[in-house]
Amino acid sequence: MALKPRTGNQYVISSGEWSAVVTELGASLRELKWRGEDLIVPFDPNKVIPCCNGWVLAPYPNRVTNGQYSFDGEDYQMPIDEFDRQSSLHGYAYRYMWELVDLQESHVTLSWRSPDIAGYPFDITITATYALDENGLT
């Protein structure tokens, strides 16, 4: 039995002259083509995903300085993962396998429930849908 790629299952969708591949790991957009031409830089499904390529940036999409923030009167400290800037960067959804919710010829939907992680104790579920039509990706 062959091993799964490092990035998990590969979900292929297409519509007309468009095609895309979305990975189970992080619900990342690995490939997007129009008329067979790459529109993004594709990455190898058996290698670590290059930084930020096709990532779903969740539960927060940017840097949190010193990994610290306050919410509803409470202070939180998230892990620092961008050491040169002392920031917590781009959330962590890209590090986890997402659950397949729906796969059709022209669209795929994946879902992920955030674990209780240091500094982000909120119970959230994120759903990502990639859909192709004659106009491209939505």
Question: Model segments located where?
Answer:
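Surface-exposed acidic/polar loop and edge beta-strand patches at domain peripheries
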Residues: 1-137
